[in-house]
């Protein structure tokens, strides 16, 4: 049975390439790792019954991006929340047994209706897989929501991530 949640230390191991095997999906290391734990991952859950991932990121005023984005007006860059959603789709593909290294391929639509400021305590990412392709092409297509303290603030439709073997990346 596959593991259904992951601690920060386990995510760091994934970032070192120790989870899915050499040449396969890895998460980025901090500070680009944009979540502290995966609280739920399921192969057949979510809105579309194709898979679900939920992760959390503890926010504190000392996080690196608040010091530079923006001086006197600290806010987490929206692109980091978008990247976190891509990270989670890639993790799902590796967790599902897909071979290769993850690469973001695009997103259909992104809406920002709120922000992450230093007073926010927790960001939650919710990813609903719409399509999972496990052939020569390994790709996940998903919708995602980012919440700040339980309030939806970003929405992404058709997040696309692919896994590519060394041979595919060389050609």
Swiss-Prot record:
It holds the Pfam family FabA. It is found in: Cytoplasm. NCBIfam families: fabA (TIGR01749), PRK05174.1 (NF003509). GO terms for biological process: unsaturated fatty acid biosynthetic process. The gene is fabA. The keyword Membrane does not apply. Homodimer. The lineage of its organism: Bacteria, Pseudomonadati, Pseudomonadota, Alphaproteobacteria, Caulobacterales. It comes from the Bacteria. Belongs to the thioester dehydratase family. FabA subfamily. This is 3-hydroxydecanoyl-[acyl-carrier-protein] dehydratase.
